[in-house]
């Protein structure tokens, strides 16, 4: 196994990009794409072939959970980094939708659009990493959160990192007479895996420093550690034990099922950590229920309270 090669990874795990990269070995059976030794079986429903049906249920469940989290974040009107966290969650929804498209065969691997959707998926996951790092630095309050300047810096940074990864993926997948092609995937591996792993590591270290030296709240440290545990467990189940899981489950699910589930739990822990270290700055909580005003400009509750003494 050479550095940057997906040959060994794709032999064990049915990653979406495995259908658009080639084995390093020129004598491979397929001109393009690496078929894993074991992968989840497909299901035919209404003359439509659906791949990774178990993974699809996890994605739909993840979308519901993220919508609930977004509702809770929007309710914390004055919390630090509220808009930035909402942007992170919107990116997470985009990533799950793109994963549904490439995992479940909405765009078949044989179609010309498949490579573009895989590039979008990798680009969104990269943008999600840089957005998470920005949210982590925001908690140190080096700059004002929620302002137009802060949001535009976040948007431009995420779009730039998305564009870089997207372009690297497309050039690698399409082989447009460049130094990159579907057999030379070292650059793709560095951008999609190595650099994003470094970004996530910096985020985790920064949040541990924030909790230990600034907040001194060890309950929130537990949320960080749980998030790291779920993320690492998902990567291990996806890239190491996928083949064994697939064979043990009789091809019904593989490592992608458990990896996607662990990613959803990771999103939940990221939100929980943010929720624990932030609070509303209002003196009184803000309710979403509007109070009716009578013709004298007095609310119903105010009228009842004043009538007790006057």
From Swiss-Prot:
Localization terms from the record: Endoplasmic reticulum membrane
Stretches assigned to coiled coil: none
Main location, first listed in the record: endoplasmic reticulum
Entry's transmembrane regions: 50-70, 86-106, 114-134, 151-171, 194-214, 221-241, 257-277
GO molecular function: unfolded protein binding
Keywords annotated in UniProt: Cell wall biogenesis/degradation, Endoplasmic reticulum, Membrane, Protein transport, Transmembrane, Transmembrane helix, Transport
Superkingdom of this protein's organism: Eukaryota
GO cellular component term of the entry, any: endoplasmic reticulum membrane
GO biological process: cell wall organization; chitin biosynthetic process; endoplasmic reticulum to Golgi vesicle-mediated transport; filamentous growth; filamentous growth of a population of unicellular organisms; flocculation; negative regulation of filamentous growth of a population of unicellular organisms; negative regulation of flocculation
The protein's role, per its UniProt record: Chaperone required for the export of the chitin synthase CHS3 from the endoplasmic reticulum.
Cited PANTHER family: CHITIN SYNTHASE EXPORT CHAPERONE (PTHR35329:SF2)
Protein name (database record): Chitin synthase export chaperone
Species of origin: Candida albicans (strain SC5314 / ATCC MYA-2876)
Organism lineage: Eukaryota, Fungi, Dikarya, Ascomycota, Saccharomycotina
